[in-house]
């Protein structure tokens, strides 16, 4: 059996050896849920890697967004170069789900842009799970959405050895059945080309290698792995497996059965509409469904085939879909990174998806079976788990309840770094006081993070400091991930010194050059100033030996006191350990590398070098265009359950509409 081989020049240090031993023993013992409370910079990823290597079982690492997933993917690939480390996130660069708005009788057609690189990585992930056990999949919550039956996916793959009796034409038919496209001119992933008795296949899970199958009559004469660009042979093979180009594939028998069930359900639904005199809905449903059936009959596929997945999977109404979790063997281990965020994300996906699809079904755009093309409910998700390890610096109540309150602590950092010193100062003159601290800190070549409560405050503070000569930028929710990564890289390289943000300076911001974190209006109780948020924000200063935090507040709230107490407790443990072992704290040394540069996404945000265009400078003629753009962004944000951003956009729209009335 394949084993995980951990490749690292480092040995576990600090609290890591104890945490690795306790978690590994818990898994072997059969503990269903465990919690790893690991402070920022304590090497939680390295601990997870050691646990995986120790228990030698397939693992799913669940991250709260694509950015952190990409970071973890890069780190695990470095730690396990000889094993299958895969990446499974949503493959959409842009996604507009189909929707119907009854009040305006507006149907919005599905529109999307698929990232080919991520699609390749998704196929590589499912292929690895079906062919080996030394697999680590790093995923976002995309893993709870339906992707088709693993049994059908496995059954439809093509496997042959050199010397097999296998006709060339038979191979071509099978390739078409599993959604490969013949293209003799543009050879790319998911296509094949034919040159006499030679068939070349570009597998869906590959980006740089293709297969060449040479026939002699009806015999497989030779199999080679080739460079698809140059056409040269890389290596000779004795066997070869080609997996489907889509996760939604089915045998001809399954397809015929599914189409018959669709026709039966269509007849019943049409009768239901007609009995209620809903003739427009009946005509609409019949036209759309019959078109899809014709496409399935001819091509074995249709646009939006995922809405019929229940029929292909043989599921009953209401039964959960097959997801990535069903591709794992039963004994897999789940690691939930930043669990205080990720767990709640899993729970929220089902409800938003359901309400949109119910409208489509009620107005005749989809059969009721479309409701079963959905993410898992939270209960269905937990039913599919074997053993879980929740990883966070601030575990939430759910995780603690699941583990019975038992927590494996990882408070001591391998670098000997202490939690930052926290100082509370009055908020009355916070801007000018912070300016003095910023100048002192940047004079030493160190960086500063500043977190505010509102976008306007972030903008105004940035403008004010920039006018005074401070090299400053700010993070806000209109900036996409690629820009965000570039901004953080620029901060680390010293292109600027101060980064201002709102709720974006918490999890996953790994910047060792930052020695000062300033929290403005720290005494304003709420989501952004909860104890958990404050601890996470303070953690951004924990990778620098000079790390410190200034909370600007006129009173010490309960959340602030909890943060102060927890930080003091951790510092006491860390100082005692360093004294006992003669350790001198050292700032984390981290290279400026970019992970997974080809991947684009929209889960996190970056910063513009200048503030956005203010409403005051918009002419009356420009306002309608601006309102239309903002309204679309607001609806998109609401669909993604980003209600804080949607509310902010709503307020901007209201201001612009009021301004238009004044100007006209």
Swiss-Prot record:
**Organism domain of life:** Bacteria
The residues forming the signal peptide are: none
Residues annotated as binding ATP = 38-45
| PROSITE patterns tied to this protein | HELICASE_ATP_BIND_1, HELICASE_CTER, UVR
Q: Please report the stretch or stretches of sequence annotated as the Helicase ATP-binding domain.
A: 25-414
The Gene Ontology CC terms held by the record are:
cytoplasm; excinuclease repair complex
GO MF annotation terms: ATP binding; ATP hydrolysis activity; DNA binding; excinuclease ABC activity
Where does it reside? Cytoplasm
The record places domain UVR at 624-659
Under SMART domains, the record lists: DEXDc, HELICc
Q: List the disulfide bonds.
A: none
Q: PANTHER family from the xrefs?
A: UVRABC SYSTEM PROTEIN B
Q: How does it assemble?
A: Forms a heterotetramer with UvrA during the search for lesions. Interacts with UvrC in an incision complex.
Q: What is this protein called?
A: UvrABC system protein B
**Which species does the entry assign this protein to?**
Geobacter sulfurreducens (strain ATCC 51573 / DSM 12127 / PCA)
């Amino acid at each position: 059996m394949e084993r995980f081989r951990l490749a690292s020049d480092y040995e576990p240090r600090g609290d890591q050896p104890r945490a690795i031993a306790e978690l590994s023993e818990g898994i072997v013992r059969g503990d269903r849920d465990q919690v790893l409370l690991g402070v920022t910079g304590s090497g939680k990823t390295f601990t997870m890697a050691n646990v995986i290597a120790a228990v030698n079982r397939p693992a799913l690492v669940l991250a709260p967004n694509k950015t952190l997933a990409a970071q973890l993917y890069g780190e695990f690939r470095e730690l396990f170069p000889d094993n299958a480390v895969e990446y499974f996130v949503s493959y959409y660069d842009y996604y507009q789900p189909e929707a119907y708005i009854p009040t305006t009788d507006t149907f919005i057609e599905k529109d999307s842009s698929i990232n080919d690189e991520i699609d390749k990585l998704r196929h590589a992930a499912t292929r690895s799970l079906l062919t080996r056990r030394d697999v680590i999949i790093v995923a976002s919550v995309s893993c709870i959405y339906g992707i088709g039956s693993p049994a059908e996916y496995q059954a439809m793959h093509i496997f042959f050895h050199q010397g097999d009796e296998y006709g060339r034409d038979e191979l071509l038919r099978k390739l078409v059945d599993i959604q490969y496209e013949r293209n003799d001119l543009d050879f790319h992933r998911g296509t094949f080309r034919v040159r006499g008795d030679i068939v070349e296949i570009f597998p869906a899970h590959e980006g740089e290698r293709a297969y060449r199958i040479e026939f002699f009559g009806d015999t497989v004469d030779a199999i080679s792995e080739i460079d698809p660009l140059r056409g040269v042979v890389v290596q000779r093979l004795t066997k070869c497996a080609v997996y489907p180009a889509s996760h939604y594939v089915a045998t001809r028998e399954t397809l015929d059965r599914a189409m018959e069930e669709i026709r039966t359900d269509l007849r019943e639904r049409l009768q239901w509409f007609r009995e209620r005199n809903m003739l427009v809905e009946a005509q609409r449903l019949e036209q759309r469904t019959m078109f899809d059936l014709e496409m399935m009959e001819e091509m074995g596929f249709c646009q939006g085939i995922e809405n019929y997945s229940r029929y292909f999977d043989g599921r009953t109404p209401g039964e959960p879909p097959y997801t990535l979790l069903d591709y794992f063997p039963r004994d897999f281990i789940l690691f939930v990174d930043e669990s205080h965020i990720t767990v709640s994300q899993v729970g929220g996906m089902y409800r938003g998806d359901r309400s949109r699809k119910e409208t489509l079904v009620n107005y005749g755009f989809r059969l009721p079976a479309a409701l079963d093309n959905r993410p898992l409910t939270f209960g269905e998700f937990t039913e599919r788990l074997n053993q879980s390890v929740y990883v966070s610096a601030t575990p939430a109540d759910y995780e603690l309840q699941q583990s019975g309150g038992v927590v494996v602590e990882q408070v001591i950092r391998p670098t000997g770094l202490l939690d930052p010193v926290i100082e509370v100062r009055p908020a009355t003159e916070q801007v000018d006081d912070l300016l003095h601290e910023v100048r002192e800190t940047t004079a030493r070549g160190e960086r500063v993070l500043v977190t505010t409560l509102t976008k306007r405050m972030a903008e105004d503070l940035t403008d004010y400091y920039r006018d005074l000569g401070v090299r400053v930028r700010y993070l806000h929710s209109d900036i996409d991930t690629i820009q965000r990564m570039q901004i953080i890289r620029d901060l680390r390289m010293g292109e600027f010194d101060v980064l201002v943000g709102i709720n974006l300076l918490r999890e996953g911001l790994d910047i060792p050059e930052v020695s000062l974190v300033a929290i403005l209006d720290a005494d304003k109780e709420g989501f952004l100033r909860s104890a958990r948020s404050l601890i996470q924000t303070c953690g951004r200063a924990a990778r620098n030996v000079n790390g410190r935090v200034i909370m600007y507040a006129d009173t010490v709230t309960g959340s602030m006191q909890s943060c102060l107490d927890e930080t003091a407790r951790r510092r006491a443990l860390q100082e005692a350990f360093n004294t006992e072992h003669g350790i001198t704290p050292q700032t984390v040394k981290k290279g400026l590398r970019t992970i997974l540069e080809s991947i684009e996404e929209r889960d996190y945000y970056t910063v513009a070098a200048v503030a956005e265009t203010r409403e005051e400078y918009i002419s009356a003629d420009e306002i309608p265009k601006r309102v239309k753009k903002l309204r679309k962004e607001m609806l998109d944000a609401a669909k993604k359950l980003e209600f804080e951003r949607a509310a902010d956009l709503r307020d901007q729209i209201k201001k612009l509409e009021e301004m238009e009335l004044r100007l006209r």
